[in-house]
Amino acid sequence: MSLSARISVTSLYRVEVSGWDKSQTFFVEKSELEWSEDSGKHVTLSSAVPDGSVVFLRLIQPLTADRSQSVPYETEFLSVTPDGQNQFRLHPVSPRIVDRGSVN
């Protein structure tokens, strides 16, 4: 009888996160994106970001002059770390379809 164990691999990426914090102040912060197939994408920020808000992540690529494109994510607040950092799970943002055929 063979038992196969599933190994979860977590990858870390340096990212630049930007958006608006709880006081509606725009911020840009460097952090690490933790990416796992099992638990999804997580980021820890010093900025207090409202739950459910949209932030933009840009991958920081060393050794290249090219800037990657920012990608929007919706935040899901998870917890505050012992040192006061805010932990979030990130969910992809899909474009919303607006019905412009309605006349008010």
Question: Where on the chain are the PLM-derived regions?
Answer:
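Structured alpha-helical
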Residues: 1-104
